[in-house]
Amino acid sequence: MQRFKISSEFNPSGDQPGAIDSLVRGISCGAKEQTLLGVTGSGKTFTMASVIEQTQRPAIIIAHNKTLAAQLHEEMRSFFPENAVEYFVSYYDYYQPEAYIPQSDVYIEKDALINDKIDLLRHSATRSLLERRDVVVVASVSCIYGLGSPELYSEMTVPIALGMKLDMCQLQERLVELQYKHGNRYERGSFSVQGDVLSVFPSHYEDRIWKISFFGDEVDSIQEVDPKSGMVTLKLEKIKIFPNSHYVTPRPTLLQAISEIEKELDECALQFKQCNKIVEADRIVERTRFDIEMMRETGTCKGIENYSRYLCGKEAGDPPNTLLDYLPQDAIMFIDESHMTVPQIRAMYNGDRMRKANLINHGFRMPSALDNRPLTFAEWEDRKPTVVYVSATPGQYELQQTGGVATEQLIRPTGLLDPVCIVKGADGQIHDVMCESQATIARGYRVLITTLTKKMAENLTEYMREMGIKVAYLHSDVKTLERIEIISDLRLGVIDVLVGVNLMREGLDIPECALVGILDADKEGFLRSTTSLIQTIGRAARNVEGRVILYANVITKSMRTAMEETDRRRDIQRKYNQEHSIVPRTIQKPVQTSLSERVGSSRKKVSRDTNTDPANRDIVELQKEMLLCAENLDFERAVEIRNEIKRLTAP
């Protein structure tokens, strides 16, 4: 068995050795939950990696957004190059859920754009969890959403070894059952046959094909082939073909599920008729019968996840299978930025249920569709393994769970102090932050600026661009892989300034950043709370020149608390440096190969300014409005906007 082994030129230093020992000791003594309070730049990721190495236990790290998950994934890959470090996030670039608006009698079909590259990484994650123990999965909160049963997923795998008796026709039938497509094109999740050779492109790889040669009904050879060059890269003795969908089901189980679906359909249609809802009764019968026929013929159907209760053999109301069910029992769960991630986990269930209720009440889905859902918070609590909450500002829940005790990691290995905080008047803040940015850029550093509204961020970005500054605007509409590219461009100097509304939530790790500008810091609210301010201040804590300017006309309670906590930490850090003769130095961190580069970014290399072409500007604005409508459950308006976008982009 491959063991976890960190590859790094650094050794634990500062508060890291004590934090690592404390967490490992707690895990060894059976502590179910612990909290790591680590300031920005103190090496929390290295501490997590060290805990994994010392305990030799599989781990999942849950982050509150895809950008942070991608950064953690890259860091963990660099620490564990010989181990399986996987990435599991939602594979939707765009997602509009199925919905019904009774007021206008409008049904909206599910509309989604799946990112095939992220789907590949999801399959790689589940495969690793089932095949080995040296696995670290970095995930977003999508890991608590329904996923196929790990038992069925594992049961459906097809092992093949040299010399084994195997009928090629039967193998083709098995591959179709695993949702592989038959064809001559080399694409992931497909297979083809030429003479006595069957070529299969596994669901969990993007850069290799397996060619299986037969001599009669016997496997004669197994070769790994580069799909681009056609060259043989490896000769194998055995392989295991994993399903191309997490919802594949053995034929007997599928037929049993169909029988149960038909029973519920009869009951559902009868209830509608008894209530004199003839339209709804006809609708549910027509839609469900169509799905049943598709499942009988192909093993799947559109929206098959809505029948997951039956496919996984669950009872009504049972928790769904999720990625957590693929984890070994002794796994460690790290909740990164727990002050943000825990509330996200808590909120997932209710929104999903409210939307499905309309579909069920009007005959678009049967009640069993309610079991295709994320875990409730209580279910998540029941299923979580050993947990370590990680944050610079742990929330009330985390501290309650750990009895108010937290392992502190305030001393950075580099000796860096928390940044100096300066308060300036909000009047004239745009001009001042422009001048401060230009001075910072002239010294070779980068700048982060956070505003209160998207409109203000857009206007500031446009103004700075007109003034000749290389600037980009980071916002929620930017796709996952493009967001990672923008952050990489900032570090490389392709851009010098990054503007955003809630930059602290993006998990930005920019050692080159020497200035953070917080506009309208005195406007109390979520974006200017104590927690948010401390997190945002921390963005400048990786550079010895780091400064934070808070633009405010009054000092609010949140500002005062955040600055006092920053000063407390600075005092502790300064005393430690004096006692150990440490001279602070900027964190040295190479710009690693981004996730998008490794899986093939779909982003076109175009100017950051999407507003140069009026037509492009219209489409971008419409896309933003469409996504906002979907988030606000205004699906009718979202569909209208989607249709308008299709009209504008038609050739």
Swiss-Prot record:
Domain Helicase C-terminal residues, every copy: 427-591
Cystine connections: none
Subcellular localization, as worded in the UniProt entry: Cytoplasm
Residue ranges the record marks as coiled coil: none
Region (Disordered): 593-615
Stretches assigned to the UVR domain: 616-651
Single GO BP term: nucleotide-excision repair
GO molecular function: ATP binding; ATP hydrolysis activity; DNA binding; excinuclease ABC activity; helicase activity
Keyword Zinc: no
Subcellular location, principal: cytoplasm
Name assigned to this protein: UvrABC system protein B
Main function: The UvrABC repair system catalyzes the recognition and processing of DNA lesions. A damage recognition complex composed of 2 UvrA and 2 UvrB subunits scans DNA for abnormalities. Upon binding of the UvrA(2)B(2) complex to a putative damaged site, the DNA wraps around one UvrB monomer. DNA wrap is dependent on ATP binding by UvrB and probably causes local melting of the DNA helix, facilitating insertion of UvrB beta-hairpin between the DNA strands. Then UvrB probes one DNA strand for the presence of a lesion.
Record-stated family: Belongs to the UvrB family.
UniProt-listed HAMAP family: UvrB (MF_00204)
Keywords, ordered alphabetically: ATP-binding, Cytoplasm, DNA damage, DNA excision, DNA repair, Excision nuclease, Helicase, Hydrolase, Nucleotide-binding, SOS response
Keyword Cytoplasm assigned: yes
Domain Helicase ATP-binding span(s) in chain numbering: 25-178
